[in-house]
């Protein structure tokens, strides 16, 4: 069973500011509760083809995986994907102008778990949606308080 989770939030900051912060992998541990560290596997700056290793904890397990940037349109869209492990994942961020100079950000995670993980896909989907909501709220708090 495929997992496809979309979560949105409106942030009271300009789109270019929200996108620049969210698309910078070095900021991920600041707003993703489960991401503990980020290691660049390719030289900066961020570009299509860049590889970034994330160490995370999700559902009580430590996960280390390398994402590759697949698409980068500053201020509009950022796509990265990993083919590693039992749960290959594609993560997409999109940003659009919202009312009063704010930004609507959508976080989408798509994956196709294999083996035992495929049986747990409905549970994983619910947990992922819950965590994504928390993460986007944290991103909003960080950006609106600065």
Locations of regions flagged by a protein language model:
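Short beta-strand segments that buttress and anchor functional surface loops
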Residues: 51-57, 78-84
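Hydrophobic ligand-binding cavity/cleft-lining segments
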Residues: 1-47, 144
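Short, charged/polar surface micro-motifs in flexible loops or helix N-caps
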Residues: 59-62, 71-77, 86
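Generic structural detector for well-ordered beta-strands
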Residues: 8-12, 39, 55, 68, ...
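Beta-strand elements of well-folded, non-transmembrane domains
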Residues: 11, 58-60, 111-115
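A short, structured loop/turn motif at beta-sheet edges
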Residues: 15-16, 43-46, 70-75, 94-104, ...
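Short, surface-exposed coil-to-beta transition loops
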Residues: 4-6, 62-66, 88-92
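Beta-strand/loop substructures that line and gate deep hydrophobic ligand-binding cavities in soluble
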Residues: 79-134, 139
């Amino acid at each position: 069973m495929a997992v496809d989770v979309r979560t949105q939030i409106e942030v009271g900051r300009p789109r270019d500011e929200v996108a620049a912060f969210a698309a910078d992998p070095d900021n991920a541990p600041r707003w993703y509760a489960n991401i503990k560290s980020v290691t660049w596997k390719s030289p900066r700056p961020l570009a299509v083809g860049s590889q970034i290793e994330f160490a995370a904890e999700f559902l009580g397990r430590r996960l280390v995986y390398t994402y590759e940037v697949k698409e980068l349109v500053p201020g509009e869209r950022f796509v990265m994907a990993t083919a590693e492990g039992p749960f290959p994942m594609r993560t997409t961020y999109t940003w659009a102008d919202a009312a009063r100079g704010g930004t609507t950000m959508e976080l989408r995670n798509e994956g196709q778990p294999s083996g035992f993980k495929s049986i747990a896909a409905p549970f994983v989907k619910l947990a992922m949606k819950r965590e994504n909501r928390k993460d986007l709220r944290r991103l909003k708090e960080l950006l609106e308080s600065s």
